[in-house]
Amino acid sequence: MPRSQKNDNFIDKTFTVVADILLKVLPTSIDEKRAFTYYRNGMSAQSEGEYAEALQNYYQALRYEIDAYDRSYMLYNIGLIHSSNGQQSKALEYYYQALDRNPRLSQALNNIATIYHYRGEQALINNQDEISKIFFDKAADYWKEAIRLSPTSYTKAKNWLSVRNK
């Protein structure tokens, strides 16, 4: 089950060592340990661009993880992978699932807004002005909420909103 760390990043190695120690000393259930190990392996694979392996690990982690907050990050990362693979609709599904479990996950709100903004841009290119307005309005709503939750983040979104008088 443990994944070998190919990454030479000091912070990643330190995290792995600390996580392994914590898993051994903290009073956690076997399922919690399995969930965390799969999640950590998923993050490692994802950081190395091994998306299929990362997805397998995240799906396994979801089988064992019961905490909604922790599940939200697993679902969010699955959404990131689908987005990276150009599967925007599938990414949206996972971002929404992440938000259902953790409504304060501003990163998911930002990514949803980004997808809607992209769809708005595509509609403009195809001379679908009314459809583009719908997507841009959705993007604005999600960015506003992301900014409300994380006021020091999302500078480009703030600028876009101010230009559009939103």
Curated annotation (Swiss-Prot):
Localization per Swiss-Prot or TrEMBL: Plastid, Chloroplast thylakoid membrane
Annotated signal sequence range: none
Alphabetical GO biological process terms: photosynthesis
Alphabetical list of InterPro entries matching this protein: PSI_Ycf3_assembly, TPR-like_helical_dom_sf, TPR_rpt, Ycf3/AcsC/BcsC/TPR_MFPF
Source organism of this protein record: Bigelowiella natans
Positions of TPR repeats: 35-68, 72-105, 120-153
Protein's name in the database: Photosystem I assembly protein Ycf3
Gene this chain is encoded by: ycf3
Family, as annotated: Belongs to the Ycf3 family.
Pfam families documented for this protein: TPR_1
Function (record text): Essential for the assembly of the photosystem I (PSI) complex. May act as a chaperone-like factor to guide the assembly of the PSI subunits.
Record PROSITE patterns: TPR, TPR_REGION
One Gene Ontology cellular component: chloroplast thylakoid membrane
Membrane protein topology class: Peripheral membrane protein
Keywords: Chloroplast, Membrane, Photosynthesis, Plastid, Repeat, Thylakoid, TPR repeat
Domain of life: Eukaryota
